[in-house]
Amino acid sequence: MRRLILLMATMALAILMASGVAQAIINGEPDGNMHPYVGALVTEVEGEDGQTEPVLLCSGTLISPTVFLTAGHCTEFLIQEDLPTYVSFDTTFVPGQSELVSGTPYLHPDYCVGCGPPGVKWLPGYDVGVVVLDEPVEMETYGTLPSANLVDTLQKRSPLTVVGYGANDFATGGGAQQPIYPDSRQMATTEYLGTQGIANQVGEDVFMKTTGSGMGQGGEGTCYGDSGGPLFLDDQTTVVAVTSFGPTSAIPCSGPDYAQRVDLQVVLEWVSSFL
C-alpha cells in the first residue's frame, strides 16, 4: 500500500490508475526461473519520512543484453517526472537489497493518451517503451520480437503466458479493497480473444484482447503492477504483446485484459532501432 500511495502522489500516474492502466498476476503461480529475462522496472521516490526509496513500478522483458521492453505509460511516467530508472531481474524484488541496473527510458513517438475513440479518450495508443541499460546483462536466453502481423494469424482461444511482478490478490474488509503486492515474478495462462473491442483506436487494431482473471471466479490474468510485462507464445520467448490496461469496474482486475501489440510494423521498427 505504501508503494501505491507514493506513486499515486503524482497526477500523471493517478490518472493512469484511475483509467485502469498499470496492470499484476491474479490466480497465477510463482515463475521461479521459468522466465529469468522478465524483470521489474524500478524507480526511486521520496517516502513519507523524506527519504528516497526504490519502488517497483512496472514489468518488462529483456530482449537483448541492453534493451528492456515495457509499456509506454511506464516510461512516459519516468520521463515526465525525470525519475531515475532501474531494472531488477531478481525473482522477488526487495527494496534496498535487490540488484539494480540503471538505464535510460524511451517512449514510442506515436504514443498518445487522449487520442482514443469517443468514450475511451484516455486510451494510450501505441503503449510501448524501452529502457536502454547502462551495463549489459548477460543471460543464456532473451525474449524475442515476433514476426510482423503474427497476431493476425492466431486462432481465438490460443493460449498465451503472461508474466509480471504485480498484485496477486486484494485485502478485503474495512473499506475499499487494497491490492496485495508480493513484488515477485509470477506467471499465468490466458487466452487470446481477438483485436476488436474497446481497446482499439478507430481503424487500428493496435491492441489485443485476452481473457482476464474474472476476479473471484478462478480465472487467471493481470492486475496493478503487471504493465509492460510480456504475453508469450508457447515457445515462452516470443513477446507478441505487452500488458497495457484493463477496463475499470467495481471489482478491480476482473478482466478482460488488453495488451499493446508488438507485432505491428511501426512498433517492430522502433524497438528494433535500439538493438
Regions found by a protein language model. Name each.
Residues 8-17:
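Bacterial N-terminal signal peptides
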Residues 124-128, 132-219, 257, 264-268:
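Chymotrypsin/trypsin-fold serine protease catalytic domain
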Residues 1-4:
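Positively charged n-region of N-terminal signal peptides that target proteins for export
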Residues 22-51:
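N-terminal activation segment of mature serine protease catalytic domains
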Residues 31, 56-79, 83-89, 181-198, ...:
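C-terminal subregion of chymotrypsin/trypsin-like serine protease catalytic domains
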Residues 26-33, 52, 76, 81-139, ...:
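Conserved catalytic-core segment of clan PA serine endopeptidases
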Residues 45-47, 68, 74-76, 112, ...:
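Solvent-exposed loop/turn segments at secondary-structure junctions
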Residues 46-65, 123:
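A conserved glycine-rich beta-strand in the N-terminal activation segment of trypsin-fold
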